[in-house]
Amino acid sequence: NVVQYVKRKAKSLWLPFVLINLFFTVTQNFFLKIGIYSTDAGASVLPVTPLDTSAAIKKVLGNIIFSGGSQLAGATWFLRSLFCITIVNAVITYLLKNIISKKTYVFIAMVVAAIGMQLVNNNVGSISLLVEKIGLQSFFAGYFAYLIGMILKKTTYMQFVKQHTLSCFLLSGVGLLLLNFIGKIQLNVGHVENVAFFALSSLLGWILIYIVSINSKWIASCVEYIGRHSVWILGLHFLSFKIVTMVYLKIVPESNVTLAAYPVVYENNRLWIAYMLIGIIAPLLVGYIWHKLFSFLKSMEIYRNNA
């Protein structure tokens, strides 16, 4: 049922996007006041202006249709792209189910996605301008990866990886290391180097995570937990970075760096390890406390109703 599917995806992807950006819209002036944002451009600082009521309302309405966003909610591009990808795929599959086979559809869709991805990557023509305007720079690359996943589900790919764990682990690890020196992927802005580079990086990255997960129950549990609570990470990822920046500025005071540095103080030193860990752990901790509090309040309500 396509309608039910759309409703389900709206609840799990669209609604979190709107609520997260609503939170950062409401708190924008407060964050400006305490220095998390700044009106002045500086070292790694993207200036933010105060919001009046009309500007805030306009921003909220824009977020309802996936337009715009907030600086600290930058990671929510993933929710927007995944929603559009899954809905487009579901609708097209439904409309074409009696016209062409699914294999034919996947092949055509992959060709279109690959062309679109390369055009966006190279900033070619009106397609690049259009996707930038509506904030879907990552759509074609994400759709391409989504289709790869659909294909792999129909193969014995996972079984092959299980049977050749060590060789696949070494291949994926060394391969990703070499690719890191060749180019980089910035999916949020549609930069993928080229189609082959993106496809190979995606496959090798998946193999590495899969092998590590199946050989460690603890890591598998962690990956599963992170996956089930990823909305908290997407929502609070960049805000959590401010914890690291704040501690760094206490230890190493620098006049040319402020708390408003975005997304991080420096990108090319070991601080990225702290940013990565805090950017995941802090949101998960907030989510854990929230769910515990919600469960407690719910149990108290049930207790009062039964008293």
List each model region and its residues:
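Alpha-helical transmembrane segments and their immediate juxtamembrane cytosolic regions
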Residues: N1-A307
